[in-house]
Amino acid sequence: NNAINIATLCISAESIGCMTACYVKTVEYTKSREQFGQPISNFQVLQHKMVDMFIESEVCKSLLFKAMLECESNEGTKNKSVSALKAQIGLSGKLVAQDAVQFHGGMGVSDEMSIGHYLKKLIAVDALFGNSNYHLNKYSQL
């Protein structure tokens, strides 16, 4: 069980890296993409959506740090923290990557853009060691 927890922490850290990359690349892209004579990053609705992406990745980062500390100190709540982390990673990862693809339009799913690859990676990671539904159920039973 400890090995599964450590592996889950590792893939969660990787997922947070993917989410952060999606956010950073989206911000860069929206600054360079122009519509109606101005960068699309100037539109408030898109700014709010990008802030949501940032918040989702920061929530996951905080849960990762909490789970790492509890696994290190061998507290009885480490399984619960790891399940909370994995459930949130599954939900937030897909949300952030799907939003990034939407910002990039059709280019977001092309092989030339890394955003589509991050989406595929985050969907695959959700299935490893139990998906978000599995960990939500496990969390509620602990």
Language-model region placement:
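Alpha-helical interface subdomain recognition
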Residues: N2-L142
